């Protein structure tokens, strides 16, 4: 069966609440460890997300946990809670040996929807690592997420377009080739975003 990413929040309803598990009284570090327990991961995630910036130190420390499920969960949390100090750590997590962690890291770097007023990272921080993974990461899921991040800069950086065109032409995965094609001239996302002003496209407010 192919691996399918399931957002943690999609699993919330069938599971116990944080109050039932006593997580309201649990310290941040213990909650981060619970991200590696399939029976408690969703409730721990919700409680850490509720604590927000107050839990950031423990979440960042969790990026170095030996359990890849903990590292993945921390990347997902930073999707919502990312700040200036966390961006470099997320870039480093894209090199994680577990592909699920790399996927979560690239999503956190590329997605504005979850971040409220947080500025997006600029090309100086993320474009070269994203291009490298798009070209050579062994996992197609990671390459697909890298394409999304590279695509954010397709209107502002020729390196992004060149990398996406190469991926669209040569990637061994049809899914990655298709996604890369969305972000090059003539592609659906590229042409739709071309109608927006530069400020509306906004990957260009660097942290």
Residue ranges of predicted features:
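Short, Lys/Arg-enriched segments at the junction into DNA-binding effector domains
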Residues: 136
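Structural detector for internal amphipathic alpha-helices that build alpha-solenoid repeat scaffolds
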Residues: 2-23, 29-33, 38-53, 58-64, ...
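Terminal, low-structured helical/coil segments at or just beyond the last alpha-helical repeat
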Residues: 182, 186-207
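HEAT/HEAT-like alpha-solenoid repeats
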Residues: 87, 122-128, 160-165, 196-204
């Amino acid at each position: 069966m192919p691996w399918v990413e399931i957002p943690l929040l999609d699993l919330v309803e069938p599971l116990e609440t944080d109050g039932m598990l006593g997580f309201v009284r649990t310290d941040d570090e213990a909650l981060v460890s619970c991200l590696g327990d399939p029976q408690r991961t969703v409730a721990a995630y919700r409680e850490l997300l509720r604590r927000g910036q107050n839990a950031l130190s423990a979440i960042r420390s969790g990026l170095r946990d030996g359990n890849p499920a903990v590292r993945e969960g921390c990347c997902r949390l930073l999707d919502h809670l990312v700040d200036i100090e966390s961006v470099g750590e997320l870039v480093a997590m894209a090199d994680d040996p577990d592909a699920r962690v790399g996927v979560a890291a690239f999503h956190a770097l590329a997605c504005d929807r979850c971040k409220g007023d947080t500025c997006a990272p600029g090309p100086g921080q993320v474009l070269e690592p994203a291009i490298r993974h798009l070209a050579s990461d062994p996992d197609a899921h990671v390459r697909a997420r890298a394409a999304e991040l590279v695509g954010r800069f397709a209107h502002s950086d020729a390196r992004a377009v060149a990398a996406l065109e190469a991926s669209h032409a040569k990637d061994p995965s049809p899914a990655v080739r298709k996604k890369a094609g969305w972000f090059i001239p003539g592609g659906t996302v590229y042409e739709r975003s071309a109608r927006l002003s530069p400020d509306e496209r906004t990957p260009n407010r660097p942290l």
